Every structure is written in structure tokens, then in C-alpha cells.
A protein has these predicted regions:
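Active-site-proximal mixed secondary-structure blocks
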Residues: 1-114
Length: 114
């Protein structure tokens, strides 16, 4: 699957659909380890002239520890054909297994891109 970079000013998708129906995959890396989870609560917009995305993540979630310890995080969108994988990321804890490896995903670090 190829990565498609979309500049924020060219982002022409409904955040209501992406977050509420299609879901997002949020991934963060801290201390040499990465973890991801399905995110379905949040929003996108502009605050004080800056493009922003925000997520609401329960404090008990293992992924929140990664986000809190990281300089940033990534948001990815996958097509309907990956719905089962997205459901897996939302139902299994990274405390128990390496979800990225099991889903055959490799995190790429490329700061400042969407």
C-alpha cells in the first residue's frame, strides 16, 4: 500500500466521516517503541492560524502513554478493505501484543507531513 501525502490546504475530506465513520489510526513512538490505536473521537480545524487535529483518548489507554511521551503523532486513514484491521487496533491493547507487527504495518518517521 502506497503512502499518499496530502497537504493540509488540499485536505478535502469530511472530518465527520473520517473520524466518526471511517475511523483514524493514531500512532506514536516513544523510547524506541511504537503503538497505534483506532481513534473515533476528535476533530480537525484551525486554531490561531495553525492547522490542528485533536483526539480524545481515555487516560487508561496504552497508546496515550506513547502520545504523551512523543514529540508528535501520526494519523492515518485506510480504505474499507482494511476495516477488520482497524477494528483489531481498537479492540486489542498494545500492552499485550505488538499490534503493528501483527497487522504487518511499519511505522515511518517523517515529521511535519500529513
Amino acid at each position: 500500500m502506497a503512502i499518499k501525502e496530502i497537504k493540509a490546504e488540499e485536505f478535502n475530506y469530511s472530518p465527520f466521516r473520517l473520524i466518526g465513520k471511517d475511523w483514524l489510526l493514531v500512532c506514536a513512538e516513544a523510547d524506541g517503541k511504537a503503538n497505534a490505536m483506532t481513534a473515533s473521537w476528535g476533530g480537525m480545524g484551525v486554531m490561531w492560524g495553525k492547522n490542528v487535529a485533536f483526539l480524545v483518548i481515555r487516560p487508561q489507554r496504552y497508546t496515550k502513554e506513547f502520545i504523551d511521551g512523543a514529540e508528535g503523532f501520526s494519523l492515518s486513514v485506510f480504505g474499507e478493505e482494511r476495516r477488520k484491521m482497524m477494528s483489531y487496533f481498537g479492540s486489542v491493547s498494545g500492552r499485550d501484543e505488538d499490534k503493528l507487527a501483527k497487522a504487518d504495518l511499519t511505522p515511518l518517521q517523517d515529521a511535519g507531513r500529513m
